[in-house]
């Protein structure tokens, strides 16, 4: 069982929050997975110009305590700099990403815990700045 919460109804395939329950394989995640080509270009442009903003988000104590870092699944990372970007750009490791997500495995017991709402909310709150950054990128006109 799983559910997805979108953060912006006006954007197709907008960033959001994902809660997945599967025995011994539950997790919580957020961000945007495999955005469409034009959206990916907008996100990379935002990262290139506002790298410091993204760096602050992923270095934030709350984010790091819940998710450590953005997901870097090998299949979702380019081997080289994306077309049009300097391979020495300060944000090159972010620019190589094809998806901009963070996820964390969670114990199945959280779903029956009396504090379920509070525990899940703290994780979703930690993801909000990432989703805000991604929404800002997607709302930017070319």
State what each model feature region is:
Residues 1-9, 60-66, 86-99:
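Short, surface-exposed, charge-dense and proline/glycine-enriched linear segments
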Residues 21-80:
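Compact, glycine/acidic-enriched structural inserts
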Residues 9, 25, 36, 108-110:
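Residues that cap or initiate secondary-structure elements
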Residues 1-22, 26:
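Short, conserved beta-strand/beta-arch hydrophobic-aromatic motifs that form part
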Residues 7, 32-34, 104-106:
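Short, structured patches in soluble enzyme cores that scaffold and shape functional sites
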Residues 48, 69-142:
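Long, solvent-exposed, polar/charged low-complexity segments
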């Amino acid at each position: 069982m799983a559910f997805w919460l979108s953060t912006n109804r006006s954007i197709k395939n907008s960033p959001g929050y994902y809660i997945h329950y599967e025995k011994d394989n539950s997790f919580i995640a957020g961000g945007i997975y495999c955005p469409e080509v034009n959206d990916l270009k907008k996100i990379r442009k935002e990262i290139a110009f506002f790298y410091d903003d993204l760096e602050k988000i992923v270095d934030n104590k709350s984010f790091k305590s819940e998710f450590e870092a953005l997901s870097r699944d090998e299949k979702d990372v380019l081997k080289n700099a994306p077309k049009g970007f300097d391979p020495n750009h300060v944000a090159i490791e972010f620019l190589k990403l094809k998806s901009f997500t963070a996820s964390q495995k969670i114990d199945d017991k959280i779903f029956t815990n009396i504090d379920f709402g509070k525990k899940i909310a703290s994780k979703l709150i930690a993801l909000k700045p990432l989703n805000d950054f991604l929404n800002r990128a997607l709302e930017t006109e070319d």
